[in-house]
Every structure is written in structure tokens, then in C-alpha cells.
A protein has these predicted regions:
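Terminal, low-structured helical/coil segments at or just beyond the last alpha-helical repeat
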Residues: 657-686
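Acidic-histidine catalytic/liganding microenvironments
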Residues: 13, 164, 310, 353, ...
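C-terminal structured "cap/appendage" subdomains that terminate the fold
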Residues: 629-660
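Amphipathic alpha-helical protein-interaction segments enriched in hydrophobic
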Residues: 538-540, 578-588, 614-630, 657
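An N-terminal, helix-rich hydrophobic module
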Residues: 1-118
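Hydrophobic, well-ordered secondary-structure elements that form the walls
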Residues: 586, 626, 638, 668, ...
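TPR/TPR-like (Sel1-like) alpha-helical repeat modules
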Residues: 485-490, 642-650, 682
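Acidic, proline/glycine-rich low-complexity intrinsically disordered segments
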Residues: 4, 36, 90-548, 553-562, ...
Length: 686
């Protein structure tokens, strides 16, 4: 046959149209099976069978298109038709094929438009295609105590994904608030701002482990990929790497060479050391939630056991240093010697693994929380972000450092970026609220604080800021009491990191009673119970003597004040540069009528932590000095300090509305200079 005639005949018999129709339908069926089969747990082999069958069916379909035509009477062999009927049949066949092609193409276009249409978060932000949240993995082990192991697998996969710059990966602190398998994925992705979620389960029995994972396009509620892994426990690192790589491939994320290396890197080759490490991680999460010193101690013990098994386990070494710095910041300050040891530990982790993001965070915390060397801390946090672009912790710490440097706009920008990666973490809006409060932007502070408490009703920063945006912004004591009634009743609302002036020493709950001039209730709040570690700790030890001073009843607390003074003086000998101890001692000395020593302690605290070094706590420490001066007869100096505080961002402690209602200023309230402050203006903004 002449080739030209052959191709003409192919066209005449609608074979070309049939080929196009078959290709379009085959593509649609392939997409359909890859989306639907995993939903019913149909093995991947079935999908491969469909693809192979469609490929093998193509030449058969082309032969049938050559041999047969559609006619009004049905399907008939082309050779059996007379010329007129054949022409009608070919036209009918062509129309049918056109309808098939157009119909399937419309379905394909609709599917693509739906999948690619930009979704939006609750805040109205566009959700990127390459975004994912790794939901908590379900523990299917018969031993329910193996939950720590399932959590650890999830966290390690998430950590590997966080190193991919081309992906948006939600932090674990946000995903931890959801169930392993959410019934309403569309709500989840709107709240988290992602297009995809990874669900999984872990079953551990002896030295065997089964990991089931499935990647879901949550907007369309379709499965992109699913797989089961049955491995020895010692091979679990390979599973974590494979899952992360499969997800990156499924979402078409571009990997830089260093990112590919990080995905393939195992934290240790010792499975028992890894198990001990995961137990430490579980305890560390509990410690950060409860702020109980014993939880931090248990976490450190597990990390040390892991390091004993594998002395080169850099991740465990870094996390040990991180845990110790968290304890230092939230619970009890380290001595200079202890701090030097933690610094050595963190640096050792980086020496073992220079590209370990967690190591850079640990060293950064030593510089930030330990030595207040802000530039060095920022350098470490930036390095961590380069290694793990989705690490919300590094962003949060960077924002906090910039805030202490008084770089308010940059601080807020970084907190907002952190909020995109950690949208359900209450600390982020609470920190934003605190920043606005310091800037005396009361409405913005109120709004952010309420957002924080919506996420977590027990968030200390949110409670403190919401209460003080009212008291400092409007001076409305009744509204403040109403706000207080919404807080957990057992919480005195104290925080060591806020330990700057008398309000922080006494705590927000008791201090509201003081503002109401109800001193007996304030004292009752601090009655030490049989099992009350806070009242007996450095955090609350000076509260009762300080309340007696404000009540004008210092004489009744001499014995207690002498005992507390002895404890704090011993602590100061161990940690001579701790401003928290000095501010508390200043009030104890006032209670003991040792005014000169009270002034000396308060001034020493301001020298250690001036505003120039800390734009958040510095004004609070200076406020404490003004309070001590007001009670020690140094009226002129107290007013001078207050004048300065009203002219800079210091809304956490000082505002005109607060000066009008706070009993701490009663000793100088009738002074003309103080009254002039009340009639003046206050600085608002950066």
C-alpha cells in the first residue's frame, strides 16, 4: 500500500481520533486510580496493573478503530458497509469520538482547576501547593507506652522535611494539637495553611517495627501516595529518610545537594541509643509544657543515657544542651560554672556535626539566654534557618533577640513569619501581644493576646498581656477583674522570665487584689500549701513580704523576711549577676527596713540589665528601682525615672493609666512632680 494512501485511510477511518480519545481516557483513568485506590488500601501493584493494561490495550484499540465503524444500526465491520453507509458511519464515529475527547478533557480541566486553585487559610492567606503538615502518628503497638516511639518517628520525618527550602512545613507544636487521623481535613488545612497532610501509624513489637504512611491532598481529599514499611528497629532511620524523600518527590520539591544529604543522614547507628533519645524528647516536651524542674531533669537523664551508648550522637548532645538552657531560663538560673559546661556541650555537638541545625540552636540559646550576647546568638539562629528553613523555633528566638535589641518592626515581622510555620502555637501571638504592650499599642496587644488564649487557655504570656492591656491601657479595674475571672483559678500567673519589678514578684492574680486594695486576699493567694513548690521556690519566695510592704505592714513579716533574705543571699552568692534575685532582695530589704541595702540591690540589678542591653526586661528592672526609691524616700529620683520610662517603649510596667491606680506609687502620689506626670503624655510606638 502506498504510505500516503495508508495515512489517508487512517484519517478516513477515524483512527487518529480514536488514538487521541484513547490517550485522553487512559490518562484520566490513570489519574483516577492513583487517587482513589490508596483510599481503599488497594496495593500499588493494582495501579501498576491498570497502567500496563492501558498501554497494552492501545494497539488493540487502534486495530478495532480500523476494522469497525459506529452506524445507526450499531457497530459494523468497515468492509461490510456500502459506500454511503460507510460515510455516514465514519461521520457518526467521528462525532462520538469528538464527544468522548471533549467530555474527558472537560473533566481533566475541571480537576486541574480544582487542584491548582489557590486555597486560603483562616486568615485569608494563599495556601502554597508545596506545603505539608505531618499529623501525629498513631501508636498501634500493644504497649501503649510506645507512644514516645511513634511521636519520635513523626518528629524525625518532620525534621527532615523542614530542611527542604522548597517546601512549607508546619511545626510539630501546631500539628500535635490534632488527632492522628482527622475527620475534617479541610478544616485542618485551613487552620494550618497547608495543601497536604501526612498521616501515619507505628507498630513496634520487639525488634520489629511497621510504619504506615499516606500523603493526602487535603483540599481534594485524595491520596497522593501511600506505603507500608516492615523493618527491623535498627533500620528505622532508613524508613524516615525514604518517607521524607517520597514526600519531596510527590510534591515535586526541588532538593539542593545539601538537602538531599540531610535527608539521607541518620542521627545515630545505634538503635538503642536512638530509643533512649526518643524517650528524652518525650520528657522534654512534657517539661516545656508543665515547666516542672523534675521533667527537665528526666529529659536530661535520658539524653545522657543515649550519649553513653553513642558518644558521637550529636543530636542527643545538642538536645541535652537545649534542655539545660530551657531549665536555666524557665526554672532556675545556672551558675557561671554550670553555664560554661552547657556551652561546652553545645559546642561539642557542633564539632561532631557542623551542619546540625539543632546544634546551632543550642549554641544560640547559650549566647542568648546564658550570656546575652545577641549578635552571636543571631548568627547561630540564622545558620540554623539556612539548614532548616522551616524551623519556627529559630525564627521565634531570632524575633525575641531583636525585640531585646529594641528592633521592634523586625521582631514583629519574624514573629509573623514564625506564625505561618507554627499557626497553632500560642506562644507566637502571645509574644506579639507582649511586643505591642511594650509599645503601648493597647488594642493590638489585646487582640493578639486573645488570639493566643484561643489557642491555649493556659498560655501565661497571653494571660499577662490581656490583663495588662486593660490595666495599663485604660485603668479599668472592674474589666480587669472580669478578665481575670476567665483564667484558670489555680494559676497565680507568675513567670520567672517576667521577674522585673514588684508585680512580677507577687504575680498578676495577687497583684490585681492589691490594685483593689484587698491585701488580705493577696496574702491568701500566696499561703503556701502542703505541696506548693512555687511558693517555696525563688519564683514566689519574696511575694508575701512584698505584699506586706505595699500594705504598710512590714513589721508583721520580719521573721519571714529574714528567712527569705537568707535564702536569696545564698542564691546571690552562687549567681551574683542574676537580676531576678537582686530585685527580690530589694523588696526583702525594704521589709526589713534596710533601705540603703534595698536601693543598692535595685541599682545593681539595673547595672546588670540596663535598657540598652534588654529593651523588654530592662525597663522593668528600672521600674523596680523607681518603686524602691518611692518607698525609700527618694521621691525626686523615682519621678525622674518614671519620666524617662514614659518617654520610651515601657508599656509592660508603666503607663499613665497604671500610675493612677497602682498602690506601689502611693508614697509619692501627692507629690506635685508625680501629679505632673499624670497630666502629661506617654510615648506610643517604637
Amino acid at each position: 500500500m502506498n504510505p500516503g494512501n495508508f495515512f489517508t485511510e487512517l484519517k478516513r477511518r477515524n483512527v487518529y481520533r480514536a488514538a487521541v480519545a484513547y490517550g485522553v481516557v487512559a490518562w484520566f483513568l490513570t489519574q483516577l486510580t492513583t487517587q482513589v485506590f490508596p483510599f481503599f488500601d488497594i496495593p500499588n501493584a493494582a495501579i501498576r496493573f491498570v497502567v500496563i493494561a492501558l498501554a497494552l490495550g492501545f494497539p488493540i484499540a487502534m486495530c478495532l478503530a480500523w476494522l469497525y465503524e459506529f452506524t445507526p444500526e450499531g457497530i459494523v465491520r468497515s468492509e461490510d458497509l456500502d459506500p454511503i453507509t460507510a460515510r455516514k458511519g465514519r461521520r457518526l464515529t467521528g462525532r462520538i469520538l469528538d464527544f468522548i475527547i471533549i467530555g474527558v478533557l472537560l473533566l481533566v480541566i475541571a480537576m486541574l482547576i480544582y487542584q491548582r486553585a489557590p486555597s486560603r487559610t483562616e486568615a485569608g492567606e494563599t495556601i502554597p501547593q508545596k506545603s505539608i503538615a505531618v499529623l501525629p502518628f498513631e501508636n498501634l503497638s500493644s504497649d501503649k507506652e510506645n507512644t514516645y516511639f511513634a511521636d519520635g518517628i513523626q518528629e524525625e520525618i518532620l525534621s527532615k522535611l523542614a530542611s527542604i527550602a522548597d517546601l512549607k512545613v508546619i511545626s510539630r507544636t501546631s500539628t500535635a494539637k490534632y488527632k492522628s487521623k482527622s475527620e475534617d481535613l479541610k478544616t485542618v488545612v485551613q487552620q494550618l495553611g497547608v495543601a497536604n497532610v501526612l498521616e501515619g501509624s507505628v507498630q513496634k513489637a520487639g525488634d520489629k517495627v511497621r510504619v504506615n504512611v499516606q500523603l493526602i491532598d487535603a483540599r481534594a481529599d485524595t491520596h497522593l501516595w501511600a506505603k507500608s514499611y516492615d523493618r527491623d528497629v535498627k533500620d528505622v532511620f532508613a524508613v524516615e529518610s525514604e518517607v521524607a524523600q517520597e514526600i519531596a518527590d510527590a510534591l515535586r520539591a526541588k532538593l539542593a545537594p545539601n538537602e538531599a544529604n540531610l535527608l539521607a543522614t541518620a542521627p545515630t547507628q545505634d538503635s538503642e541509643a536512638y530509643d533512649l533519645f526518643l524517650r528524652g524528647e518525650a520528657e522534654q516536651r512534657e517539661a516545656l509544657s508543665s515547666r516542672k524542674p523534675e521533667a527537665f531533669d528526666r529529659a536530661a537523664d535520658w539524653y545522657r543515657h543515649a550519649i553513653e551508648r553513642d558518644p558521637n550522637f550529636s543530636l542527643a548532645i545538642a538536645r541535652l544542651a537545649d534542655s539545660q538552657m530551657s531549665r536555666h531560663w524557665w526554672i532556675h538560673s545556672l551558675t557561671e560554672k554550670e553555664l560554661a559546661e552547657v556551652k561546652k556541650t553545645a559546642e561539642h555537638a557542633l564539632k561532631l556535626a557542623p551542619n546540625l541545625a539543632e546544634g546551632h540552636i543550642a549554641v544560640g540559646l547559650v549566647f542568648y539566654w546564658g550570656y546575652r550576647q545577641y549578635d552571636e546568638a543571631l548568627g547561630e539562629f540564622q545558620h540554623a534557618l539556612e539548614l532548616q528553613p522551616n524551623d519556627s523555633r529559630a525564627l521565634i528566638y531570632s524575633a525575641a533577640v531583636h525585640r531585646r535589641q529594641g528592633q521592634w518592626e523586625r521582631c514583629l515581622s519574624e514573629y509573623q513569619r514564625a506564625g505561618q510555620l507554627d499557626p497553632r502555637e500560642a506562644v507566637v501571638p502571645a509574644s506579639i501581644a507582649t511586643t505591642y504592650l511594650q509599645l503601648r499599642k493597647w488594642k493590638e496587644a489585646d487582640r493578639a493576646a486573645r488570639q493566643s488564649l484561643t489557642l491555649d487557655t493556659r498560655e501565661i504570656g497571653g494571660m499577662i498581656t490581656l490583663l495588662n492591656s486593660c490595666l495599663n491601657g485604660t485603668g479599668d479595674i472592674k474589666e480587669a477583674r472580669r478578665i481575670m475571672s476567665t483564667f484558670p483559678t489555680e494559676n497565680r500567673i507568675t513567670s520567672r522570665v517576667w521577674g522585673a519589678d514588684v508585680v512580677d514578684i507577687i504575680g498578676q492574680r495577687a497583684y490585681l487584689s492589691i490594685i483593689e486594695r484587698d491585701f488580705p486576699t493577696a496574702l491568701k493567694i500566696w499561703e503556701p500549701g502542703a505541696n506548693d513548690p512555687v511558693a517555696k521556690s525563688e519564683l514566689g519566695i519574696a511575694a508575701r513580704p512584698a505584699i506586706h510592704v505595699l500594705a504598710g505592714d512590714a513589721a508583721s513579716t520580719q521573721t519571714e523576711s529574714e528567712q527569705v533574705g537568707g535564702v536569696l543571699e545564698a542564691a546571690l552568692r552562687e549567681r551574683p549577676n542574676d537580676p531576678n534575685i537582686l530585685t527580690q532582695l530589694s523588696w526583702i530589704y525594704l521589709a526589713l527596713r534596710r533601705n540603703a541595702e534595698a536601693l543598692s540591690a535595685a541599682r545593681q540589678a539595673t547595672n546588670i540589665l540596663p535598657i540598652e542591653q534588654d529593651a523588654i526586661l530592662g525597663p522593668g528592672v528600672l521600674t523596680n528601682l523607681a518603686e524602691i526609691e518611692a518607698h525609700a524616700g527618694e521621691t525626686e529620683q523615682a519621678i525622674k525615672i518614671l519620666h524617662r520610662l514614659l518617654s520610651i517603649p515601657a508599656g509592660l510596667e508603666v503607663s499613665i493609666a497604671r500610675l493612677k491606680i497602682d498602690p506601689v506609687w502611693d508614697p509619692i502620689r501627692n507629690d506635685p512632680g508625680f501629679q505632673q506626670l499624670l497630666a502629661g503624655k506617654e510615648h506610643i510606638g517604637p
